[in-house]
């Protein structure tokens, strides 16, 4: 029985994140001997755990997400009496390789994670609900309700790994890119004499005197790669960060219609069809404007050496440095190494100095102060907005006082006024979030509460405590009865 093949290198995954929900607040009254009417003492719910990506230099692939695409953080604990707050849910820290790019469902760039220890909050945990002690105020002395915890953020994200390298090697299959990486660095990629030997990017560290740089070898391109031929353009994401692009050309190929000039032109056409994901500060500029160099490979073959010398000047007229090398005999590898090192230095020196950024990157904040009210086409209305929808999630609809508190909040926000302006009548259906209810202006919160105002207790306003004179008279009556 053959087992299914397991990929060793994964550079693009879709994951599903769900942060922890906040704990519910507690509605309780302080109970202690000789302390009647102790007042509310319900604690707040704990914050839900967030999902945080952390760059780890020891991680080099997104393979773990291929097997475990669902990430869930712990929820917060509920509040308790005696002013005890619930424990916060633990954050789920997930290790990702350097160069990971986070995209939302619409393909919008959320974060470009570069640098060991860089953190990104992928999904925020829900806030804990307030207990009745926190809801107490001058006019609401004894709330008989608490708020529910908010739901944690849940969303689907796409993770793409874009290799962090200084030099990117591009070329046709079997042009000798992997052999070049192996010859100038300590990397040991798979090398064989057939097309598409390289199926995953290979990285190598190259020493150039006192300096060092990294080289990325991506799978070979062929004409039509932008239309999906061969391995397509998927692996070109790994050269988006490269400061220098190097065309590796096979001068010893015997394929009809192939020559160094046409190979370079075909590759440039495919590169022009590629649309980078990184934009703005995260990008190094358009690939078309990136510095180029050309490596004419396999000059250990006599015919290849003649061809390389013949086309060298024509290629140099484009303003690109040209290196004629042989990875088999290691001829001219040192000039190539130091030439690439100088190109990297010149390119980095010409770039503007990057402004240091905070190590923690967060999604774009959303203004939750507004709302909209629209007719639903069936005689009802739909209220949309982050704040009213969050209030709905916080409300325990089994508690009349909590429902009344929700009505007060919506009225203060202006929802009731807007409904009246649009012609809403008592009893019409109003939908907020996932809840649909019959709307009543200033909905009462229960008969006992309505008599003395929401969140108050008539017992607190009365004064039925026995005074000293009354206690003295009572003792006198007891003594008289005892003597009789």
UniProtKB/Swiss-Prot annotation:
EC number(s) per entry: 3.6.5.-
Cellular compartments per GO CC: cytoplasm
UniProt subcellular location: Cytoplasm
Binding site for Mg(2+): 178, 198
Chain segments carrying region Disordered: 21-43, 439-484
Keywords recorded for this protein, A-Z: Cytoplasm, GTP-binding, Hydrolase, Magnesium, Metal-binding, Nucleotide-binding
SUPFAM superfamilies: Obg GTP-binding protein C-terminal domain, Obg GTP-binding protein N-terminal domain, P-loop containing nucleoside triphosphate hydrolases
Molecular function GO labels: GTP binding; GTPase activity; magnesium ion binding
Top-level enzyme category: hydrolase
Cofactors required: Mg(2+)
Family: Belongs to the TRAFAC class OBG-HflX-like GTPase superfamily. OBG GTPase family.
Description of how the protein assembles with itself and partners: Monomer.
Functional description taken from the UniProt entry: An essential GTPase which binds GTP, GDP and possibly (p)ppGpp with moderate affinity, with high nucleotide exchange rates and a fairly low GTP hydrolysis rate. Plays a role in control of the cell cycle, stress response, ribosome biogenesis and in those bacteria that undergo differentiation, in morphogenesis control.
Official protein name in the record: GTPase Obg
Gene transcribed to yield this protein: obg
